[in-house]
């Protein structure tokens, strides 16, 4: 039966029932059910089993060895999975089999003594070495790799095949940490079943296999063909039941007699619970899918709960886990059963989250999503409020701190993890709307929930391919549709409903056109993760049917979930007034307006968190009460982050938003408070700056590019200082908070020494440059004529390149530390997500390692700073003259221009600086990638450069919009006294020219 041209609900119901029937019909009372795809890794272990026949030793499963020979790739590897550790495992185990068969051909001497086998071993060895050399262990999440890979390498070494690779020490460090807690007497020889039983092959030569026989169920060890094969090879007595189990897997598993086996068989509970829960969550009712087979499948799950005393594993009578327990409980409760989750809570709840199984290394986002959904669908949901809030906080912490697409150790598609998070958090918000739970979260925590939900849906929408799919994949497209189905319910998407509907319709068309029978399934996607990756045709079809159900169902009252949170989303008309300005700029001109509207809403969701901390550094005394810039700052960052689908983490975005706010406020503070307080003794202000910053100074002394000679900052009308001590202390306190904001940030504290020195230098230069610019303004205003600035004998070129009061350099110094800390740094990511002590966080690596990359990075900073200064001055000639600020056009060189006017000259120089910035960044990219020694390192650096590009691109809209509308706040004291600093940068790094394409839109 195919899923083609499906338009009516009755047809979908028939297909859902048919899928359930197929699942039930494949069930064996003794062995269960499983449709998981085969794996070269487990097949290789099965091929290594030998048995005496009439006193003659023979390979027991020659068909498995034949499968390995038939499926070796030209490059010597096995498996086409994209995950590096998949290819390593699927190559290492078959290589071990080839080597042992070559050493001991037994009855396969015709095959094994052929010279072709030596060539195969040679190619496999070279392939494995390449894979190990490029392996990035820190980003590997596969379960058990830290014990399985070292064990395989040891077995290969015993065969004379030794491997050395860059990440070997790191691997063995992780391995040692895992085995430090390994006690076979407790973990394997006792009565309690642990997940280690699933990987017994990793303990060959370490454990006594005769002491684990009591854990055998249905002939297998935790439904693992490889573990069972290892047992057969190492037990002192032959086990016919274990042999029969492997024979059954070879016949009834997805290999269907061709010699291959999956990594797990049976997988009844997993596949049945995913089948039912997926269909039911998508809107199929118990009545829709009613059939005798539904009762059979549900009954099997119920019996597993009874046998497991309230929890279940992926198959009957094996170790329980939270994931399968939660999925099955959700499905059965939706079908009208009364399944308690009390035992799940008791067994799997830990301090900060729910663990999938005891002693897991890394927490699973998907398992906590499924746990949350199960908790939210309990009849007495309020009884589980502490556990619900724990899950919610964990999920938001995962999303908030994950750089790029979020992934999980049970499924490699980020769309799967995103789908589950969106489903779970949407249900949570719906429960809050219905008053089913007290809020329990503070303002910041609730804002984070809204941000994570919105980003999960929006980023999914933005990644849709032109053919309507995601990654040209049916299953992943189905995940995306289920995500967008939740987006239709959310109040944050009420201004984007038509775009959601269009995306879902296109995706449904793709799924219909590319659907096939289970029996004819082709080109399977190995996105699910076991020891190695696999696919489940049953689960794939369930998701596709669920997606079509969502696509063809009307949503009652769309766009209302979350309304009780009072998020204050502006009206569409008001939003469009803002985005109209941005849409005129070259950077965003080609984007659909709805994408800018979505980015504005995303930025708006950051405001509650920003407002909680906006006064942490500066109290806003004597500041302009109009904080219009606060509404725009988040938008500029979300818009550029979404524009090229960079998707830097919310943690990174928030830090950049707050840096923008604080930079802007510092500009006002240095003008309206510090500049006024010390107007008659600017040298005292410089001394105060030095006092505040000296404790942070990194030794050896950081080179400072704009230190000011004390004599140069004396006020021309200098007299004895008469500054109130309270005023001095106020400035000192604010300067200390400002310094701490930057230099006490974990990213700076954990940065390499050179990067910390850069951050310190730029904070120092920024503050001192403000003092110098105040002096320049004062000197200009004391001249007899104010048209030309002649008090300082400095050419314009040198002046514009020494203006560090522009926010670009200080932000650049901060980003130099922030990018290595938050971008492509799994160590920090795991620690923060796990809510672990900061003391375990290791130092970030250096931002730029070579002399060339350091040079080009500094050059990028200088050029973007120059662009900022030049184009801001171009747009503020009139305002600066009115407010008695020094402007570029006050320099005598502007008396003669080649371009026809002062503004045209500024534009020409701005374009020049822009071109220099582009050229420098291109050189920076090349130099950064050139010193990477592995593909994993190159990928990490590419990712970091992409995030650097967001920082640079955010310079673009500020300058362009600034000349359309001035968002700069001005203090009343400036107008009254005539003492002004620049206050030119609208939030953060302003530039009137895009770094990519087009010229600035300027008001003339």
UniProtKB/Swiss-Prot annotation:
Signal peptide: none annotated. The keyword Cell cycle does not apply. InterPro entries: Ent-kaurene_synthase_fun, Terpene_synthase-like, Terpenoid_cyclase/PrenylTrfase. It catalyses: (2E,6E,10E)-geranylgeranyl diphosphate = (+)-copalyl diphosphate; (+)-copalyl diphosphate + H2O = phyllocladan-16alpha-ol + diphosphate. Mg(2+) 3 binds at residues 872-873, 876, 880. GO terms for molecular function: copalyl diphosphate synthase activity; magnesium ion binding; terpene synthase activity. Mg(2+) 2 binds at residues 667, 671. A motif (DEXXE motif) lies at residues 667-671. One of its GO terms (biological process) is diterpenoid biosynthetic process. Mg(2+) 1 binds at residues 667, 671. Its cofactor is Mg(2+). Its EC number is 4.2.3.45, 5.5.1.12. A motif (DXDD motif) lies at residues 321-324. Keywords: Isomerase, Lyase, Magnesium, Metal-binding. The keyword Isomerase applies. Belongs to the terpene synthase family. PANTHER family: (E,E)-GERANYLLINALOOL SYNTHASE, ENT-COPALYL DIPHOSPHATE SYNTHASE, CHLOROPLASTIC. The DXDD and DEXXE motifs are important for the catalytic activity. Involved in the synthesis of labdane-related hydrocarbons by catalyzing the conversion of geranylgeranyl diphosphate (GGDP) to phyllocladan-16-alpha-ol in a two step via type B cyclization into a (+)-copalyl diphosphate ((+)-CDP) intermediate. This is Phyllocladan-16-alpha-ol synthase. It comes from Phomopsis amygdali.
